Curated annotation (Swiss-Prot):
Entry annotated with the keyword Glycoprotein: yes
Ranges annotated as spanning the membrane: 701-721
Protein topology in the membrane: Single-pass type I membrane protein
Name recorded for this polypeptide: Envelope glycoprotein H
Keyword Transmembrane tagged: yes
InterPro entries, sorted: Herpes_gH, Herpes_glycoH_C, Herpes_glycoH_C_sf
Length: 725
């Protein structure tokens, strides 16, 4: 009876109540005009009658009330509509009252005593930007860019999100984009519609929906709930603009999601001005910091749920942003690159088996009209063309563009060197500065984009290999110490902010004991070492994602990789892969050091025995000229007891002079410390005396003059000898 009353009230009343916005004009509450009949008829609702009533055009319900009847009527024509059939097919008309009551207890209902809160904007909720700010505006505007970036964040719905036969929610079909994040333990799904998103969290091994948490946020008026539930039953949070509904079974709530009733749940996110994408990204960075520092990668906790919620929210807010054609490109490129960087953070932190969940801009980018080829058959390499227009950009914006156009499985598969070549000057400058001072936040912001751009290019691009060896060289003991200090700052957590070249994948020789010893020697708390290793293991790429010649080496194997133009050096404690093995003899017992020389693009073959063996060529000193014959070589410092310590690339004569200057105190002259010079052609030298004499080469004109003088002297001596005969 109760269900019949609900249906009659809903269908015979013309007053429509919205969650927000204007009301429909008021008409008499209990009348519905039927235009499908010749004469006007009205349905009777809650009227008294002294006899039962029936009508061919109506469903009529007569309930005895004393000596009379209460009459309720529903027009038959309303049940012929698609909406009515959808409603009736979703409702069990034969359900008993007892079953109805039990069903109400199946799902978690938000308690009145404190979990539900209206979250207001907090003027004191300030999130310092740090490097999470757009770079300085450049002279390049949206209309100058070769690709249309005015809607750079907009993701066109390519799927239909469907909810059918749900115990709580009426059937719903909404155009959306669908992002799946899967790792050992859980599957997280972000379904992004135009006005709201749905975040679902489900244990991977659970093939039912018993433990699934669903969070609807945004303008959720399209979500209709079945009786006995109302919107208020699942309304966990409200802001002035949006609502949050949570749908989860009571047993799952008790076992897994009790944090939903925490008063501070989502407070940091919803109290900020999250409609501003830049602010949303800063909040997300703080949550990423909590997850990474708290060793919560791969877990489902209150902090990780807040992180995934805010990640979804930032995408929803950015999705509706449109930039003016005259606006500088800096803000748009920075925001999109940050969104995709957070996707990389998720992929590495949670060790997902799915790719970067952020929809890549390059999958939907289109050339602007003025850059489209005259004929469709003319292929245009976007990266080459982008490099020609990047001269007016700040280096940070150029790094954003290079990262957004990074090579993936999306054609073209080979990233040209155009943008990377322009960024090489910046990477080289930062490397030279890192020899003197710690890396700054703005440097790290650019270097992470360079790192993620070159990782997949180590097989094809010589420029990418030069970037990689510079990043490897920046991972020094000084960097480990300064990075440890940075990781202790709770306000820094975005991938851009906590990046270190030590997670680029070049140096895997740093271990827990070695980092602890380093921190102890620098008088740093032991917790610094634990933090450094925790973040390193969480964010460092797998070897399988690197260059071909060393991608089969297990990730657990310690060692360093140094890339030259046509050679790759693998430094480890033992022989691991097939290649030219060069043992290093100057180590103590039980401290082995092996250098394996590999050809670029050669297949990686695991092997514990070597057939090719080389040797280290010992040189008392090496003399360089201004032509820098050994430039593009790498100087490796190792300790007889502690093993590999520093890697220093030599890109230019200026760097060589700085490294060998005694006043800079970089090269150490002790009996335990040795230096190896790894050249570009695969030869390994040991410099025993740490003596490198840099002297200018003779000018060409002087050489020619000396040669002429020598010839004349020889000719004079020849004639003199003939005369004496």
């Amino acid at each position: 009876m109760k269900l019949s009353l609900i249906l009659s009230i809903a269908l015979c009343s013309t007053r429509v109540v919205y969650a927000a916005g204007a009301e429909a004009p008021r008409i008499s509450r209990n009348t519905v005009k039927l235009h499908s009949y010749n004469e006007s008829r009205v349905c009777r609702h809650d009227e008294s009658s002294n006899q039962t009533v029936s009508h061919a055009a109506m469903f009529t319900f007569n309930f005895q009330d004393g000596d009379g009847y209460r009459v309720y009527q529903v027009p038959r024509c309303l049940f012929n509509t698609h909406a009515a059939r959808e409603v009736l097919s979703s409702v069990d008309m034969t359900e008993t009252l007892e079953s109805y009551r039990k069903r109400f207890r199946v799902y978690f209902v938000v308690p009145i005593y404190g979990a539900y809160r209206l979250v207001a904007r907090s003027p004191t909720a300030k999130y310092p930007g740090g490097v999470l700010n757009p770079p300085p505006a450049s002279s390049v505007t949206m209309q100058d860019l070769i690709v249309d970036a005015t809607n750079i964040h907009t993701v066109v719905p390519d799927k239909l999100c469907v909810i059918t036969e749900h115990p709580v929610i009426f059937s719903m079909k909404v155009p959306c984009s669908h992002q799946v994040i899967t790792w050992t333990g859980y599957t997280v799904t972000v379904s992004l519609a135009q006005k709201f998103f749905v975040l679902t969290i489900k244990p991977t091994r659970d093939h039912t929906s018993e433990n699934t948490l669903a969070m609807f946020f945004g303008d959720v008026r399209e979500v209709d709930l079945k009786a006995p539930y109302t919107v208020g039953a699942f309304l966990l949070r409200q802001t002035p603009d949006h609502d949050l509904l949570v749908v989860v079974k009571q047993t799952a709530f008790i076992q897994r999601y009790m944090f939903l009733t925490d008063v501070v749940f989502l407070q940091r996110t919803l109290s900020a001005d999250y409609a501003d994408t830049s602010v949303c990204l800063r909040v997300l960075s703080v949550l990423a910091s909590v997850v990474a520092r708290g060793k919560q990668c791969g877990l489902i906790t209150r902090d990780t749920v807040e992180f995934f919620f805010t990640y979804s929210l930032c995408q929803l807010m950015a999705n509706g942003t449109r930039y003016q054609s005259t606006a500088p490109v800096s803000t748009a490129l920075w925001r999109q690159s940050e969104l995709e960087l957070f996707g990389e953070f998720i992929r590495h932190c949670f060790k997902t088996t799915t790719p970067n969940p952020t929809p890549a801009f390059q999958t939907r980018m289109q050339l602007t009209e003025k850059h489209k080829p005259a004929h469709s058959s003319n292929a245009i390499d976007v990266r080459v063309l982008a490099a020609t227009y990047s001269s007016g950009m700040h280096a940070a914006s150029m790094a954003d563009l290079a990262f957004l156009l990074r090579s993936t499985r999306i054609p073209p598969n080979v990233n040209t060197d155009a943008l990377l070549q322009k960024l090489l000057f910046t990477t080289d400058a930062y490397y030279r500065m890192s020899l003197k001072i710690p890396l700054s936040g703005s440097m790290r912001r650019i270097l992470i984009r360079v790192d993620l751009t070159v990782r997949t290019q180590l097989n094809e691009s010589s420029v990418a290999r030069r970037h990689f060896v510079l990043l490897t060289s920046m991972c020094s003991p000084r960097e480990q110490i300064s990075w440890g200090e940075l990781l202790m700052n709770p306000q820094r957590g975005a991938p851009s902010e906590i990046y270190s070249p030590c997670v680029s994948g070049g140096r895997r020789d740093y271990t827990g004991p070695s980092v602890r010893a380093l921190m102890e020697s620098a008088h740093r708390p032991e917790r610094r070492a634990e933090q450094v290793m925790s973040v390193t293991e969480a964010l460092r790429p797998k070897r399988s994602q690197m260059s071909d010649e060393a991608n089969c080496v297990p990730d657990s194997t310690q060692g360093a990789v140094i890339t030259a133009n046509e050679k790759t050096y693998l430094i480890s404690s033992d022989f691991i892969v097939k290649g030219l093995a060069i043992p290093v003899s100057n180590t103590v017992v039980d401290r082995n050091l092996m250098i394996t020389v590999l050809d670029r693009r050669s297949p990686c073959v695991l092997s514990r025995s070597y057939r090719e063996r080389g040797s280290v060529i010992v040189m008392n000193n090496i003399t360089f000229t201004e032509r820098c014959e050994f430039c593009a070589s790498t100087l490796v410092e190792y300790d007889e007891v502690d093993g590999l310590t520093s890697i220093m690339h030599i890109p230019s004569i200026e760097v060589l002079k700085y490294l060998t200057d005694p006043e800079n105190d970089i090269l150490v002259a002790t009996p335990r410390v040795h230096y190896l010079l790894l050249t570009a052609n695969g030869t390994v030298f040991e410099v025993t005396d740490i003596l490198v004499n840099v002297r200018p080469s003779m000018p060409y004109s002087v050489v020619v003059a000396l040669v002429i003088i020598a010839i004349l002297m020889a000719l004079g001596l020849y004639r003199l000898c003939r005369q004496k005969r």
